[in-house]
């Protein structure tokens, strides 16, 4: 049977701290401890499940492998790069309290075969891929429907029989003091069926481990944290039950030039002192190629220019963001003597009473400093 997501087992988020994980473990371990639930096989199973989840999520190496590859990353018998493992996005509480209160969502009738687990695949994209969209081939390790037994778990020509202990319910009732509690049937392990002659291919599970390749269309404009759901592409369900879903989790690598914020892109463009003072045109990179940007005379370093429609097209609407270019004036380096002399001459022309009109910000700054010291000494 497929394992539940470890974070779900402990009822914590994927960003939970080690302290939060330990706190959740202590609470659940106390709840399901065998000493507090004598003879309760369901509680014993839950206790083992909680303990296993805790051991994985508090070991930094195992946790990193699990976060990247899911159960495949911590199970030596399974593997698959980029694969995110089981991630059951269903109702946590139905699973936790189901055995105690008569099967939770399953109701009081015959035990239904479990739906397949949801899967998660971590997909890393470049900024260009995320902005423009593309089709990706993904190789997914999963549990697939066994073709040999057609998912029944029984050898061809035979069929599962109804469990005589629970009469197909998958649960038995036990009394603990004043309370009557239900737990998984110890004979059929909650399945409601007994397979006397199991299939040689799946060993009675009705599912086999396989890898499948999917062609997934990534829409233009996706961003970090976006999740694409592929219905029915998760693990096969138990004994013919519906399959789970596949969730493709998108992350976008940092770009060497651009920073994305929503649908807008930001970049810094270096300009020379002469270009900033006299104005002119500069080349600016965009995701569609270079474009010219007109710089007015007397442009100060840090000024932001907006190029409308040069950002990212929204994945959820027809809106297109802008490209915001911040110009940064560079101080020239490795000057020869002639260049230094010219700069000295230029600097001298700015000195004196006329310097204020050439450096309005400097004038305001030094006037403020002068007033500060006057107030300090008064």
Swiss-Prot record:
Give the required cofactors. Answer: Zn(2+)
* One Pfam family per UniProt: DnaJ
J domain: from which residue to which, for each copy? 5-70
Q: Where are the CXXCXGXG motif repeats?
A: 146-153, 163-170, 185-192, 199-206
| Binding residues annotated for Zn(2+) 2, in chain numbering | 163, 166, 185, 188
Do the record's keywords include Cytoplasm?
yes
Q: Which GO terms describe its molecular function?
A: ATP binding; heat shock protein binding; unfolded protein binding; zinc ion binding
Show the SUPFAM superfamilies listed in the entry: Chaperone J-domain, DnaJ/Hsp40 cysteine-rich domain, HSP40/DnaJ peptide-binding domain
Q: Name one GO biological process term.
A: chaperone cofactor-dependent protein refolding
CDD domains membership: DnaJ, DnaJ_C, DnaJ_zf
InterPro entries, A to Z: DnaJ, DnaJ_C, DnaJ_domain, DnaJ_domain_CS, HSP40/DnaJ_pept-bd, HSP_DnaJ_Cys-rich_dom, HSP_DnaJ_Cys-rich_dom_sf, J_dom_sf
Source domain of life: Bacteria
Q: How is the cofactor bound?
A: Binds 2 Zn(2+) ions per monomer.
Q: Where in the chain are the CR-type zinc fingers?
A: 133-211
Compartments where found = Cytoplasm
Q: Which residues are involved in binding Zn(2+) 1? A: 146, 149, 199, 202
**Mainly localized where?**
cytoplasm
Q: Which GO terms describe its cellular component?
A: cytoplasm
Asked whether the keyword Disulfide bond is assigned, the reply is no
Oligomeric and partner information: Homodimer.
The record's comment about this protein's domains reads:
The J domain is necessary and sufficient to stimulate DnaK ATPase activity. Zinc center 1 plays an important role in the autonomous, DnaK-independent chaperone activity of DnaJ. Zinc center 2 is essential for interaction with DnaK and for DnaJ activity.
Family, according to the entry, reads as follows: Belongs to the DnaJ family.
Give the protein's biological function.
Participates actively in the response to hyperosmotic and heat shock by preventing the aggregation of stress-denatured proteins and by disaggregating proteins, also in an autonomous, DnaK-independent fashion. Unfolded proteins bind initially to DnaJ; upon interaction with the DnaJ-bound protein, DnaK hydrolyzes its bound ATP, resulting in the formation of a stable complex. GrpE releases ADP from DnaK; ATP binding to DnaK triggers the release of the substrate protein, thus completing the reaction cycle.
Q: What's the name of the protein?
A: Chaperone protein DnaJ
Native organism = Shewanella woodyi (strain ATCC 51908 / MS32)
Which lineage? Bacteria, Pseudomonadati, Pseudomonadota, Gammaproteobacteria, Alteromonadales
